[in-house]
């Protein structure tokens, strides 16, 4: 069971391949209502799924291990599959080990400092995006300074309020003022978290205050509205898919579907590209959030699982390099190939991923 993403997975090429290799049939169940309510009912009735992937923000997250509904993974690994310790990052394990000394779950999308240093890989997805054709028609202006940002929005208001038949919404900030205009913007301005070994007050940073004044001025001049504060997720999706936003402080991972739709539309250059966004007065490169030890979704093995030995072995496989290749790349020679010693999706798969992400996900499971 997982609390997010309803793709059942079992009929895709990737999941069939994994079943053939491991003997494990994958049946993904996603809650139809409140995840904590459904899991609480399962706890009471003794019908918890074998594996549970859950966000740490869910109210039942702590209940699962504090009230004994899930196994300690360290104990299962020591008893049945010591190779588990070879495929998990030590710093991630230490971060998620509870006060009783047990590890009850492993997160995805978690990045330890050692891993980032060794591989150069991070989870950075924060971008400043503009609609490509509109931005280029405006002369690709510099928007990294308060003056440049305001002048660009003035040009937009005066000359491009409607563009190629679309009413343009000037600006969107992901998460509104609680994320897009706080930590997200501060990261673009390279505002530090600490200075001389002490916690730094990012809110009072002069460059950050200057940019907040810039957004206030933009609102006062009618250059931006309050759409980014009040639009629902469905409204944001609709506007994105229609190329209705001009610029956005938005995580790139949320734009893949929209860009695929726009690239195949009657205006194929209406997709979004990343450019240099708001910067501090020194013009420093942004300090984009690279990922954390927390990760995102964490996976537990429930005590209703009838074969915990196979469950920990399957979890170990999924965390291993072999499992990660099977999950993200599929089958060598069919969906990916090795070029210069590095695996990469075939050109056909890349084209499908960009043009039809739904088919890419449901048919191939990648």
Predicted regions span which residues?
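Extracytoplasmic/secretory soluble proteins
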Residues: 1-366
